[in-house]
Amino acid sequence: MSIKEFDGGLEEGSQEVAIGIDQSLTGFALSVVSIESPNLHKTWVYKSEFRGIQRLVDIYNWLDAKIFEFQYYGWTIKDAAMEGTVLASHSALALGELSAVVKLVLWYRLVEPPLQIPPMTLKKYASGKGTSKKQEMLLQIYKRWGVEFNDDNAADAYALARLASGSAIDAIERETQEKIKDPKYRDFIQ
């Protein structure tokens, strides 16, 4: 297992935060941002040493422990966003299983289903256009928000957390914030 951490200055203490999750099997990324000041963040990329069901259990345990840690720090998680699964992907089944793991952890810890953001919607929010490539996303996140990453999974998780925080600095971001209020971006709870 390896963990890469990006410390954006978010400190322990009573405050509202939002989390973003880019659920990749080879570089699972989690970001937590301050609602009040979304440039303050902590972001991690977790690489499990396992495969198959062991990897799913390993990621479940790691994510569950991190969210417990956030609550221990005094952070109140107001919302969460995860990247929506692309069904046309060659690894759609494995990513669907991982998506279910993430939803279970969030359900048990937060009792609220996360926002599920399609990749094109996330790209438009973070870069201004829905077709940006990975390197362009890294550059645009730095140019728009002044936050630097050298890992595209970490950058995506940060952008998802920022989107979940409700932050918008321009018309494109405000438009995306309005768009994700549609119930189709969140699982329905009876």
What annotation goes with each model-predicted range?
Residues 1-190:
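Phosphate- and other anionic-substrate recognition elements at nucleic-acid/protein interfaces
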